[in-house]
């Protein structure tokens, strides 16, 4: 018994020294630490994804709470008398020139507009008001679509005109965007005829005055 105990005590330092190298079982502590690190990383990723989902849901809820209204309806218009030509006036006072579009496609005239305004009630809340219209008109056969002109008056009236100009049946009509000219005073055909008549009368009066002085 004394010998066996002495033998075990004599081998104990050697076994302690060579134990990590001569052990029949691999050391499991590093594997456990790697698994713990991986689990912590997965938990952090899961927490980040949950936070992103909450933020996304909060953003969607805030967007849903912002009131907005979209109105799509035609604007009022009238056909002006211009002999055998084409004259059209649309009430577009709620739209700026940049928000209007006039497009000529063949013998079709497509007029559209879209505006968006932010309305604030003064108490920290606001809403958006969107207004849009799309209207289409047919050009007369005696009107050349390439001569269509468009102008916007200071009162918000959009004037579209085209003089009489016959086309041959074989001539193709191209597609184009009609530019909108902004003017402070747009003269209608009736106004032009009256103005020309008044100018002629004034010139006649001046000529009569000069002849009397001679």
UniProtKB/Swiss-Prot annotation:
InterPro entries: A-crystallin/Hsp20_dom, Alpha-crystallin/sHSP_animal, HSP20-like_chaperone. It comes from the Eukaryota. GO terms for biological process: protein refolding; response to heat. Gene3D superfamilies: 2.60.40.790. Residues 202-214 have a biased composition (Basic and acidic residues). Residues 193-214 are annotated as: Disordered. SUPFAM superfamilies: HSP20-like chaperones. Belongs to the small heat shock protein (HSP20) family. This is Heat shock protein 30. It comes from Oncorhynchus tshawytscha (Chinook salmon). The lineage of its organism: Eukaryota, Metazoa, Chordata, Craniata, Vertebrata. The gene is hsp30.
């Amino acid at each position: 018994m004394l010998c066996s105990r002495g033998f075990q005590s004599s081998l104990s330092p050697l076994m302690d020294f060579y134990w990590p190298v001569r052990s029949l079982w691999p050391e499991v502590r590093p594997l456990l630490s790697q698994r713990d690190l991986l689990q912590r990383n997965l938990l952090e990723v899961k927490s980040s994804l949950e936070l992103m989902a909450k933020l996304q849901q909060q953003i969607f809820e805030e967007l849903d709470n912002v009131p907005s209204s979209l109105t799509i309806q035609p604007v009022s218009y009238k056909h002006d008398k211009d002999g055998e030509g084409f004259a059209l006036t649309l009430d577009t006072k709620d739209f700026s020139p940049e928000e209007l579009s006039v497009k000529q496609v063949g013998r079709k005239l497509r007029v559209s507009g879209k505006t968006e305004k932010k309305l604030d009630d003064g108490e920290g809340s606001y809403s958006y008001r969107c207004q849009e219209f799309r209207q289409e008109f047919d050009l007369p056969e005696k009107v050349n679509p390439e001569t269509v002109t468009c102008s916007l008056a200071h009162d918000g009236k959009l004037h579209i005109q085209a003089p009489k100009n016959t086309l041959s049946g074989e001539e193709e009509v191209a597609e184009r965007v009609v530019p909108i000219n902004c003017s402070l005073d747009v003269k209608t055909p009736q106004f032009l005829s009256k103005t020309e008549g008044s100018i002629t009368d004034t010139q006649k009066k001046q000529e009569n005055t000069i002849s009397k002085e001679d």
